[in-house]
């Protein structure tokens, strides 16, 4: 594998060109009106889930245990599952974007958004790990394995789906 811009004496340091690129990307991300409008729309219309016309909509999954029951996910020392997990996650996401969130909470919320992207019990990811790096640099397909959470095994099981719907206050048919 060839990494021509990595300095062996200081591998975490970026080259001047990389620094410039990161500065431009950071500026674009922080000042993008379009991104801000998209985030505002998401936060205004449900954030982590939405219920409309007796349908529950969400991005990826509801973390489940092996037996199909709702999985407890610990956030800052407290356990949440199902609807409570989605509500707490949405609240934390909003804390990251609210101007009046205290600094310590805001920093946690920003870190939590990163976790939502690739975390094991994240309702937006729900896999045991992310193997993007492995897929790019390791030829062995065994290194590419991402085990999906139990929701993906049960998402066609009417009994389990009805239990999830019930936990959100939505009646299955």
Language-model regions, residue ranges each:
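Feature recognizes metal-dependent phosphohydrolase scaffolds
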Residues: 1-173
